[in-house]
Amino acid sequence: MAVTDVDFELKIESGANLVDMEYGLETMTGFSGAIAITTDCILSNEVPSKMSYSDNVRAKLMGACIGSYKQDFKLVISDPVKSANLKRIGNSVLSELITYFICEAMYVEPPALTKKAEKVLSKMEKIENKVIDRISERVKDMHKISRSNKYPVVLKRKTKLRNFKLFEINENTASNLFNLTTDSNSIEIDAIVTRFNSFTGNWRLLADGDSVTIPFSFSGPYSKVKASIKRLMSENLHDNNAVADELITRLKITANAKRNTSGDIVKYMILGASKP
């Protein structure tokens, strides 16, 4: 039976303090579930139902170290088709995409993807939203120790030569997941579309004056959005691809802002868009 694996390291930055066992276990369970489910989706290009959890993509505990609690674990893929797909795309690309989906679930701008990772992601366009929805509760579980004890948690991919930091969760990312509010009054922004999923109407924009992109979706059912608006968003992404700053074209977007407990905008719910 073909078996492939990817090595990871999870570190709870607790300093000299002992880690509460219950909170630590819930945090690790969240990481295990989010990573395994995301991997299953990437390698099968399907989203498993909440009633089924793949036995052939599992996280296995390895050795642990004491002090800022560090836990090594191995993601083991025993299904021959998924194993072959992992060998084809490589551990690095898989890790990029795991990071991408978990960052999106946290309303955090993901790191830029390599061309190879972008190519794999493009084939998942129809299920991107479903993957994020599927892991959302696991991502909340990942934050148990950050919410309870304010400890950051860092995930790294391990290789024989070095470790690669994938992402960090902390109080700030936790604030994006709990007690979100949506403004009752709409706002107008000038923005460019930086990523757009034509199947779901979601993804990211960069508003004038901002340094990071913010996710968006339409406030109503995507099936009810006018074709002209969908085309406008898609064309803006295409028109601004690899052009000089002075040639960038912006859209005037009306939206309701979704905010975290700090008042920061984590998502725009779009009501309308037009050319200025």
Region locations from a protein language model:
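Charged, alpha-helical interface segments at or near domain boundaries
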Residues: 2-186
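C-terminal, beta-strand-rich globular interaction domains
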Residues: 172-276
